[in-house]
């Protein structure tokens, strides 16, 4: 029996040794297979990382500077090359035993985000260009307007003459005031336009800088992530993309807040400037009216004086002219008809000239006054329209607030009424229960009365 037990033990030990050898062989085979798989994965990972680095360097070189973004639009060849590269990568990955579809999807997402950033940059640049073109057009319109006003002033100004030098200078000074009013308003509009365009351009530049920083950080992250495995690359790329999006959103929010604050300050400054301009314009108009009245009186006095002096000079010159004609007649061998300029030009044309100049000056003054009055009425009408619109908007806001308050008050009142109704319902329930109890008590009292009445009858009978 002992020999049989020892043989069994030996056989069991031998079988255990065989099993151990098989397990060792299997482990060796598994380790060899794992090594080959790891080598293949490392080789494919290195290929992918090299392709990623080359693509990111290409994009970084192409889109790092804003001038290259504006000058070089995305062509169809670049898109085709990118598509071919993506197709080649997918083909190589599918041929291997390792499935790298997740990496490819992440690459596509990353490229689409870069493309979106590039499109945003281009849109900002186009908006800045449009605003600059609008500002240039406004400048051109203002220059044309100033040239038209100067032409009108030159047409309205009377011709220079020796006798009416003072009047002509006064009229020119009175007529040259109107362009100043128009030029101030136009310059203020141009300043406001330039101020409105400047924050947009600065914001576009800031957005460009932030986008360039995000692209540089992503390229650095991809270059450093070549040392890690596939899972580390995926997590790093996701975190970097999320961080870049958060940073860009925060920067955009800060820029929007700054732009809103600047816009509010500009509006307040413009309102103050407009109020000051209105006051100054009213003062200037009043001063102009008083000065014009004084000038008209002075011009009339000067015209009367000049007319009297001219008449006296004509009366004094007539006998001298007659003597000169008498002296010149015997000297001339051939009698010629008298010249018009020698006999009738000076006395007749002086009176007519003064009258025409007076009419021209009066018409010019009336035209200038009408232009000033028209501008004043237009300005007043515009100011009244703006005030009315502001008042209407304020009344609308007030009415909306009142309606909202009324609705809230009515809702609260309805709630209180509903609560009171519930309370009344509860009270009525208690009253009904009391009424029922009273009925039962009455019934019992009636029964008790009947019993007593019956007892009394029996007592009487007995």
Swiss-Prot record:
Keywords attached to this entry: Coiled coil
Question: Per its UniProt record, what InterPro entries does this chain match?
Answer: BORCS6, BORCS6_C
Bias kind Basic and acidic residues: ranges: 36-51
Q: Which residues form a coiled coil?
A: 119-150
GO BP terms, alphabetized = lysosome localization
**Segments for region (Disordered):** 1-108, 188-208
Q: Which domain of life is it from?
A: Eukaryota
Asked whether the UniProt record includes Coiled coil among its keywords, one would answer yes
Compositional bias ranges of the Low complexity kind = 64-95, 190-208
| UniProt KW Electron transport keyword | no
Protein name as it appears in the record: Uncharacterized protein DDB_G0284127
Q: Which organism is it from?
A: Dictyostelium discoideum (Social amoeba)
């Amino acid at each position: 029996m002992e020999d049989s037990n020892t043989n069994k033990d030996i056989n069991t030990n031998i079988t255990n040794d065989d099993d151990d050898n098989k397990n060792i062989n299997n482990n060796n085979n598994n380790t060899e297979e794992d090594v080959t798989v790891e080598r293949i994965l490392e080789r494919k990972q290195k290929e992918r990382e090299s392709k990623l680095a080359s693509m990111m360097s290409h994009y970084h070189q192409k889109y790092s500077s804003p001038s290259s973004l504006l000058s070089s639009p995305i062509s169809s060849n670049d898109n085709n090359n990118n598509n071919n590269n993506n197709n080649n990568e997918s083909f190589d990955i599918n041929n291997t035993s390792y499935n790298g579809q997740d990496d490819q999807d992440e690459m596509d997402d990353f490229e689409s985000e870069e493309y979106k950033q590039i499109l945003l940059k281009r849109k900002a640049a186009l908006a800045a260009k449009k605003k600059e073109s609008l500002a240039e057009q406004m400048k051109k319109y203002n220059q044309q307007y100033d040239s038209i006003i100067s032409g009108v002033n030159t047409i309205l100004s009377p011709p220079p003459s020796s006798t009416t030098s003072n009047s002509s200078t006064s009229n020119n000074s009175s007529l040259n005031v109107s362009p100043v009013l128009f030029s101030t308003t136009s310059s203020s509009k141009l300043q406001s336009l330039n101020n409105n365009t400047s924050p947009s351009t600065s914001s576009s530049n800031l957005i460009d800088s932030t986008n360039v920083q995000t692209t540089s950080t992503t390229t650095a992250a991809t270059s450093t992530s070549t040392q890690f495995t596939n899972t580390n690359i995926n997590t790093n790329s996701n975190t970097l993309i999320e961080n870049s999006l958060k940073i860009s959103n925060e920067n955009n929010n800060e820029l929007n807040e700054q732009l809103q604050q600047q816009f509010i300050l500009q509006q307040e400054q413009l309102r103050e400037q407009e109020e000051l301009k209105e006051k100054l314009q009213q003062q200037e108009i009043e001063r102009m009216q008083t000065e014009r009245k004084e000038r008209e009186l002075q011009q009339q006095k000067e015209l009367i004086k000049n007319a009297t002096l001219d008449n006296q000079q004509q009366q004094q010159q007539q006998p001298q002219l007659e003597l000169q004609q008498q002296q010149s007649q015997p000297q001339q061998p051939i009698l010629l008809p008298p010249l018009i300029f020698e006999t009738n030009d000076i006395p007749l044309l002086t009176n007519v000239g003064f009258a025409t100049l007076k009419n021209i000056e009066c018409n010019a003054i009336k035209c200038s006054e009408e232009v000033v009055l028209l501008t004043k009425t237009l300005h007043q009408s515009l100011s009244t329209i703006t005030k009315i619109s502001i008042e209407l908007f304020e009344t609308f806001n007030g009415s909306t607030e009142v309606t909202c308050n009324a609705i809230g008050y009515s809702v609260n009142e309805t709630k209180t009424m509903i609560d009171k109704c519930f309370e009344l319902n509860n009270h009525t329930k208690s009253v009904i229960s009391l009424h029922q109890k009273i009925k039962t008590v009455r019934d019992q009292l009636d029964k008790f009365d009947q019993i007593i009445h019956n007892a009394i009858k029996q007592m009487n009978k007995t």
